[in-house]
Amino acid sequence: MVEAITPQQFHAAAGVEDWRVLSTSAATCFQTGSFARGVELVERIAALADAANHHPDIDLRYAAVIVRLATHELKPHGFLSERDAALAAQISAAARELGIAADPGKVQTVQIAIDALDIARVRPFWAAVLGYELFGDEDAVDPGGFGPNVWFQQMDAPRPQRNRIHLDIYVPADQAAARIDAAVAAGGTVVRDQGPHWWTLADPEGNEADIAPWPDFDDGS
């Protein structure tokens, strides 16, 4: 049986300096500079993944390749294992051999959060309208893995003074301050400070988003 490891344990593994832990994966971005170089890197990753029988999600763009690793059989009670750390190190080594640099500050994960009094009644609607599947007790997920996850947050009472839907934006821990500063410079305000785990920001009309770097340093406690 595969055992889960914490984000801290993942970061303690050798060779994973290029990677950051987001909400449900360890991820990085490789700056390939061209589509052909990206294909070359993806082919190397595919060979490593087949050899390990452990396959990442890969997003191939013209000048970059984004790679996300997770051990799916652990979810929803965990998402990283030693297999992810081992493959991450191998992928980074392959990129270095090709002269391709990593830029992990480019990665992020966006999640839609919906406040609900009765999650069991509300969640099926959103799964149906989005073409998603129910996952665990609080989520709806895109079966193809393309769209953002939807997480349902339990409310005890209606809160008419604030929106019922907000975005959770998971960023690398070393990018959180810059992201918050940029949002404030663009007219936003910090309305809740739970740093270093998360901050809630609002736009000039009160629409909210959470900047959440906590998965990148979570110790599992």
Q: Could you describe each region identified by the protein language model?
A:
Residues 116-149, 178-179:
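Core segments of cupin and vicinal oxygen chelate
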Residues 58, 70, 76-82, 101-104, 109-117, 159-177, 199-202, ...:
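Vicinal oxygen chelate
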Residues 2-16, 22-26, 31-32, 36-73, ...:
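Charge-rich, low-complexity N-terminal segments
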Residues 35-40, 77-82, 121-122, 174-179:
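Short, conserved charged micro-motifs
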Residues 1, 96-121, 165-166, 217-221:
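N-terminal beta-strand motif that seeds the catalytic metal site of vicinal oxygen chelate
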Residues 126, 167, 206:
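Terminal peptide-recognition signature
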